Design a protein with these regions (language model features):
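Short histidine-centered beta-strand/loop micro-motifs
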Residues: 33-35, 53-59, 100-102
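Ligand-binding loop in jelly-roll beta-barrel domains
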Residues: 93-119
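A short, N-terminal "cap"/entry segment at the start of jelly-roll beta-barrel domains
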Residues: 1-40, 45, 124-128
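Short, conserved beta-strand element in jelly-roll/cupin
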Residues: 47-49, 58-74
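Structural motif
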Residues: 71-73, 80, 96, 106
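Short acidic-glycine-tyrosine-enriched beta hairpin
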Residues: 78-93
Length: 128
């Protein structure tokens, strides 16, 4: 993961296509992609392969996912729904959820998350 501040100088432009790809949530999810952390926000370009995704988990901080390609099937707050291309998913803090790429194809999305917990040394993803 890249950092927004490098040797005291801010980096202003990030090229996701040339950044290192890695597993983004460890064993909690099949998500892979590139990410960086700014002073207060985590951002990533994430891909979930067709029919794969996350186990039930939550983040102590607020999260937004904007779907660029494909669709995500989400279970959250006792509801199941699909988030299609061009739509934004809001995940409130501490909300248990799963997100899986639909069987129709891979899903690619941008994720933004507050990093208050990370700065406090707390886990940023908690599997349930």
């Amino acid at each position: 993961m890249a950092s927004a501040e490098q040797a005291g100088n801010w980096q202003y432009v990030y090229d996701f296509q040339n950044m290192k790809k890695e597993a983004l949530l460890g064993k909690t999810s099949t998500s892979e992609g590139s990410s960086f952390t700014g002073e207060r926000i985590y951002c990533g370009l994430v891909t979930k392969r067709r029919g794969t995704g996350s186990k039930p988990h939550y983040h102590p901080d607020e999260t937004f996912n904007y779907v660029l390609k494909g669709a995500l099937k989400v279970n959250m707050d006792g509801q199941e729904f699909v988030v299609p291309t061009g739509c934004l998913l809001h995940i409130p803090p501490n909300m248990v959820h799963t997100a899986v790429a639909t069987d129709e194809g891979d899903a690619t999305y941008l994720v933004w998350r507050d990093i208050v917990s990370e700065k406090e040394g707390k886990p940023t993803t908690v599997e349930v």
